[in-house]
A protein has these predicted regions:
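Short helix-coil-helix linker/hinge
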Residues: 10-13, 26, 92
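Short acidic, hydrophobic short linear motifs in intrinsically disordered regions
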Residues: 26-36
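Glycine-centered, phosphate/nucleic-acid-interacting loop/turn motifs that mediate DNA/RNA or nucleotide
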Residues: 56
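Short alpha-helical segments that sit at the start of domains
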Residues: 1-16, 126
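Short, cationic-aromatic polyanion-contact patches
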Residues: 10-13, 63-82
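Short, hydrophobic-biased segments on the C-terminal half of alpha helices
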Residues: 49-50
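Amphipathic alpha-helical dimerization/coiled-coil segments
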Residues: 79-126
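Pre-recognition alpha-helix immediately N-terminal to the DNA-recognition helix
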Residues: 15-20, 31
């Protein structure tokens, strides 16, 4: 029976682990463990990789005595899913409310918003 990918966003730790795998392509538990800062126990990394595999974010192949993990989702797709999840949970599904919140909180100003609008319009005009 195939695995149904979980569309939910990644936790902070899951994202850190996925970033290691996106950067390296294919990794063993030990290789992921070596790249993580601060360091985590081997069993913690192994558990997290297994969770990501069950969620459908990773696949694994047995090579010798070790599993090799690789991503089944691109970084861009994961970012999109995480952003969609954030917008749904925090802004009632409204991307407009996200932008208004950024403006209200001073995290983006009118000038930057105008620049982003120009970039959006340029992209929309391209076939």
């Amino acid at each position: 029976m195939g695995k149904t990918p979980n569309k939910a966003g990644l936790t902070r730790l899951e994202l850190r682990i996925m970033q290691v795998i996106w950067k390296s392509g294919r990794c063993t538990v030990s290789a992921v463990q070596e790249e993580l800062e601060p360091p985590l126990a081997y069993t913690t990394v192994q558990t997290m990789l297994n969770i990501l595999e069950r969620k459908g974010k990773l696949k694994r192949e047995l090579r010798g005595r070790a599993y090799i993990y690789s991503a089944t989702i691109t970084e861009a797709k994961a970012l999109g899913q995480g952003l969609r999840d954030l917008i749904d949970r925090m802004f009632g599904g409204s991307s407009e409310e996200l932008v208004m919140s950024l403006l209200r909180n001073g995290q983006i100003d009118a000038k930057k918003l105008a620049e982003l609008t120009d970039r959006f319009n340029q992209k929309a005009r391209k076939p």
